[in-house]
Curated annotation (Swiss-Prot):
Pfam families, alphabetized: Guanylate_kin
Family matches, as CDD domains: GMPK (cd00071)
Keyword set includes Transferase: yes
InterPro entries hit by this protein: GK/Ca_channel_bsu, Guanylate_kin-like_dom, Guanylate_kinase, Guanylate_kinase_CS, P-loop_NTPase
Listed name of the protein: Guanylate kinase
First-tier enzyme category under EC: transferase
Length: 183
């Protein structure tokens, strides 16, 4: 059995990572989506252990101290991290493991796992991104402003990545992301 690979997927909040990954994973059940841990509150419909591992800040900080994360970062006032052991287990089983993580986490993985493929998902425009975030109706104005400011940084960092996919037309973006992950 061959060893698997790690693919890092990042992009601004609201760019459509979840929508595209759902389509990719339905077409590629052999791939494994790493479940991140976070200190943020669950959104409606999110299930602990399925969408995220929802932890208190104290629990998260204990796991940091015990080096249980492959990467971790603070984003929009919350901590996010990738539990190390499930990723290593799945790679050793020969699977493609997808990490859907923030920019700082992607940079950490680049240092710890330089062979990981790095893919950034971008919106067709900042205006389109803002509209998508507002349509969620899950954030107040201050949170939206923080996310848009962070998005500018993430868009500016696109040149750091191996592959760049623009999420403009859904079918085209799915095909491009599939190629970026599996080819």
């Amino acid at each position: 059995m061959s060893i698997g690979r790690v693919v890092v997927l990042t992009g601004p909040s609201g760019v459509g990572k979840g929508t595209l990954l759902k389509a990719i994973l339905s077409q590629h059940p052999e791939a494994f989506l790493s479940i991140s841990a976070t200190t943020r509150s669950p959104r409606p419909g999110e299930v602990d252990g399925q969408h995220y591992y929802f932890l208190s800040r104290e629990e998260f900080q204990t796991k940091i101290a015990e080096q249980e994360f492959l990467e971790w970062a603070e984003f929009a006032g919350n901590l996010y991290g990738t539990p190390r052991s499930p990723v290593i287990e799945q790679v050793n089983l020969g699977r493609t493991v997808i990490l859907e993580i923030e920019l700082e986490g992607a940079r950490q993985v680049r240092k710890t796992l330089p062979s990981a493929r790095q893919v950034v998902l971008l919106p067709p425009s900042v205006e389109e991104l803002e509209q998508r975030i507002r349509e969620r109706a899950t954030e107040d104005e201050a949170a939206i402003a923080r996310r848009l400011l962070q998005a500018q940084t993430e868009i500016g960092a696109a040149k750091e990545f191996d592959r760049c996919v623009i999420n403009d037309q859904l079918d085209t973006a799915i095909t491009a992301l599939e190629a970026a992950i599996f080819s």
